[in-house]
Regions:
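Catalytic machinery of carbohydrate-active enzymes
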Residues: 1-229
Length: 229
């Protein structure tokens, strides 16, 4: 575990998608709880920025479009981000991309917590450990302490929608997102499970909203068919 100092500058790397960010919330809260005075920055995907801006744990956000390394302009911008005076870089993504960042963009003396070969603080063997617990352990290696996140920031966040009907009828809504990455269909939760949750919530008086991309249409329709009107 790293020594805690008020002037520490911590860079966290965690890209999207949405599910990965949700799994990281406990780790984000734990990192901030253990480093209350530190400057903590989050490097993430552009699509996550609007959500990340609402989070109470970060002082700075860095957009990483994850462009190809041969895109010299984008690569230079990311390299410059890594060349700031970071006390520690916390890799919660642990992907081939972030390992390439470590190999090519990060100063040789940088403190790096992750799985990159040769990094200063390698993570333990996480075989059989779920993503949420992996990231909490990673946060603790950067001085974090166990902390369940206070989600009031999300409840109190300003709603952004073009659907005025949603904004003015003052009903209670629950959003279900049945889709997932097409590259990993095994991650998709069964439609009947979503429908069971939707039916239970509808019975309690909530309005159910199903969202997704065009690729999620089949999953959304399956859930919709099992829900009441």
């Amino acid at each position: 575990m790293l020594e805690k100092r008020d002037n520490r500058r911590i860079l966290v790397i965690k890209h999207g998608a949405l599910g990965d960010i949700v799994q990281a919330l406990d780790a984000f809260a734990s990192l901030r709880a253990g480093n209350p005075q530190a400057h903590i920055a989050l490097m993430t995907s552009p699509g996550v920025l609007s959500l990340a801006k609402m989070m109470p744990w970060f002082d700075e956000l860095i957009a990483d479009p994850r462009a190809g390394l041969l895109n010299l302009a984008a690569a230079w911008r990311i390299r410059r981000s890594f060349r700031q005076d970071w006390s520690v870089i916390v890799d919660m993504q642990c992907s081939s991309r972030t390992r390439n960042y470590f190999a090519h963009f990060v100063p040789s003396n940088a403190r790096w917590i992750g799985t990159a070969s040769g990094c200063s603080d390698p993570l333990p063997d996480f075989t059989g450990v779920n993503n949420r617990d992996r990231m909490v352990t990673t946060a603790k290696m950067a001085g974090g302490v166990s902390q369940s996140p206070d989600m009031s920031w999300l409840v109190n966040g300003a709603a952004q929608t073009d659907n005025l009907a949603v904004m003015i009828d003052h009903k209670q809504y629950v959003v279900l997102i049945p889709g997932c990455s097409l590259a990993k269909p095994q991650k998709r939760w069964p439609a009947d499970r979503f429908a069971a949750i939707g039916n239970e919530l509808a019975a309690r008086g909530f309005e159910i909203v199903l969202v997704g991309t065009a690729d999620d249409r089949e999953a959304v329709n399956a859930v919709l068919a099992a829900l009441p009107d």
